[in-house]
Amino acid sequence: MAEKKHNWLLYALVTIVTWGVWGAFSDQTSLPKNLVYVVWALSMIPCAIAALINIKFKLDVRSKPALLSMAVGLLGAGGQLVLFLALDYAPAYLVMPMISVAPIVTVLLSLLFLKERVSKLGILGIVLAFVALVCFALPDNTDGAAKSWIWIVYASVVFICWGIQAFVMKLANNSTPDAESVFVYMAIAAVLLIPVALLMGDGSGITSQGWGELTKVFFVQILNAIGAFTLVYANRYGKAMIVAPLADACAPVIMCVISLILYAAVPTVPQIIGIVAAISCVLIFSRE
């Protein structure tokens, strides 16, 4: 039992680091958002191949694990595409705070249906994770305004999709003997939505972009794919109600550190509070 506890936290920490580095550099591109999605979906393929090699290409093809794992991928990737729509109608400072607390859906579903329980110290860790999420979601500025109320609908869809995703990921892990199969189906789902992403653009194909820029974006996006891969393991060995808020709350800490080193960007007061809260919840969960 103790080994599993260490395993889930190690995998979660890999996710936190890779997502943190990814977040620090993901905006440093001139590519349209929909083409960034295409590159991200393609970056899932090498990780999926590594997963297949790890299980000697013995993919779990039973209907229940396959459908649940595909659902995980569609909820995550579909939510990302809907987020693009939300950002077309409202600035990030309105959209992101609403989406950032999506793990509350995971926590509630895990309590109700998975019967997951944590100690009083663990509850404190979850609360601190949400404090960090809110602090990092607070805007540095509030320039711009919403173009239409429809952004609330789109943001709500993302909130629900991403909140349910981690819960379904736990169900998928419980239904299959290996985490690798779950990730492979997630990658398939992401690739299947590439045509949808292309339709959301202005008609410019991905090959019309410079290969240098595409290569740079690919190496940034593969960090997200690696983080998603290790998140599946963290979710398998840990509790969904802990893993989801922990990963989402702590990745911005890495982003802040990188921004401080590279751009001398001093964290705001809310970000400092978020950093302290996030580090505190990691220390708490290391004992959970």
Regions found by a protein language model. Name each.
Residues 1-13, 101-160, 269, 275-288:
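Juxtamembrane helix-loop boundary signature in multi-pass membrane transporters
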Residues 7-15, 58-82, 150-158, 206-226, ...:
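Loop-to-transmembrane-helix transition segments
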Residues 12-33, 53, 107, 143-201:
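Transmembrane alpha-helical segments that form core, pore/gating elements
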Residues 16-20, 24, 73, 77-81, ...:
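Hydrophobic/small/kink-forming positions within alpha-helical transmembrane segments
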Residues 29, 86, 112-114, 172, ...:
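Hydrophobic/aromatic residues within transmembrane alpha-helices
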Residues 45-62, 133-145, 190-212, 260, ...:
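Membrane-interface helix-cap regions at the ends of transmembrane helices
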Residues 88-114, 240-260:
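Specific alpha-helical transmembrane segments that line the substrate/conduction pathway
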